[in-house]
Amino acid sequence: MGWLHASPPLPKNSTAERLPRCRVLESTHPALKMPHVDGCNDVLSAFNLSGYVMSGGMGATPLTWQEIQSLNESAGLFLGSWSMRQVRSMSESYCRLLNQSSEKDIPPPWVDNYEDYRRYMLQQSERNMLARRINP
């Protein structure tokens, strides 16, 4: 999700608003299909409730153990140690991908069907080439 929430830079002469990748991608983009996860609803709910990261002076940072413990107690989640470790790990991964994925051409970390993704990217590059020929 960090990849989807990252905001790639705009072209230098653009005046458009810089938006997260999830709002810029077409609805048919293969990277928008999230993996199906069974049996971890408590972990996913806790991660969503947490806000994914903490905001610091230098940008997004992973959730601290104190934040996760406070969330567990205040929201009455009753997470065990394994679940809390997963929330922490997800927060670390989210931060890493959020920071690394700010470049435009960074591929998604996961796609459901690689062939669909490859086909989609090929179609996009063909469209871009045609657009450059029409509007040089």
Sequence positions of predicted segments:
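Charged interaction scaffolds used for protein-protein
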Residues: 1-74, 81-136
